[in-house]
């Protein structure tokens, strides 16, 4: 089996369908004997350039190990699913399991926000005393 990195972008109006799509695609990979090394839902993000007059899309990243037949089936599903506006499947040499830079940046933003909120509540509590 070979390793692949799969990124697909979903129409922003169809964002509520993304969890079902992820479940369907991961189910197809695992039932065929493949493994999923990394799965990241990056959420809605600004596009670098408009695609079909859209300026945002919902991004999903998957790193999988699977047979070529499964990848061909996924590619066919992407092609005939109108909600998927772009996809990219790249073969990689090794399984990638660490967190991607996009997800790291998102985590850091959440950590900073939590720290700021804690500081605000501590300051508010100390000013009340």
UniProtKB/Swiss-Prot annotation:
Tree of life domain: Bacteria
Alphabetical keyword list: Ribonucleoprotein, Ribosomal protein, RNA-binding, rRNA-binding
Q: Any transmembrane segments, and where?
A: none
Residues annotated as signal peptide: none
Q: Where is the composition biased (Basic and acidic residues)?
A: 110-121
InterPro entries (alphabetical)? Ribosomal_bS6, Ribosomal_bS6_sf, Ribosomal_S6_plastid/chlpt, Transl_elong_EF1B/ribsomal_bS6
Its GO CC terms are:
cytosolic small ribosomal subunit
Q: Which GO terms describe its biological process?
A: translation
MF (Gene Ontology): small ribosomal subunit rRNA binding; structural constituent of ribosome
- Ranges for the region named Disordered are 110-129
The cross-references to PANTHER family, in alphabetical order and at most eight, read:
MITOCHONDRIAL 28S RIBOSOMAL PROTEIN S6, SMALL RIBOSOMAL SUBUNIT PROTEIN BS6M
Which function does this protein serve? Answer: Binds together with bS18 to 16S ribosomal RNA.
Family membership noted in the UniProt record: Belongs to the bacterial ribosomal protein bS6 family.
Q: What's this protein's name?
A: Small ribosomal subunit protein bS6
Question: What is the originating organism of this protein?
Answer: Aeromonas salmonicida (strain A449)
């Amino acid at each position: 089996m070979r390793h692949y990195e799969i990124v697909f972008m979903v129409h922003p109006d169809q964002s509520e369908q993304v969890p079902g799509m992820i479940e369907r695609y991961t189910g197809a990979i695992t039932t065929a004997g493949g493994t999923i090394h990394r799965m990241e839902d990056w959420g809605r993000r600004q596009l670098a350039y408009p695609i079909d007059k859209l300026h945002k899309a919902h991004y999903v990243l998957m790193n999988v190990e699977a047979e070529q037949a499964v990848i061909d089936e996924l590619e066919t599903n992407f092609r005939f699913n109108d909600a998927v506006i772009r996809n990219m499947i790249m073969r990689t040499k090794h399984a990638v399991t660490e967190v991607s830079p996009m997800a790291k940046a998102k985590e850091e933003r959440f950590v900073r926000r939590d720290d700021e909120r804690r500081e605000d509540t501590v300051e508010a509590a100390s000013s009340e005393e």
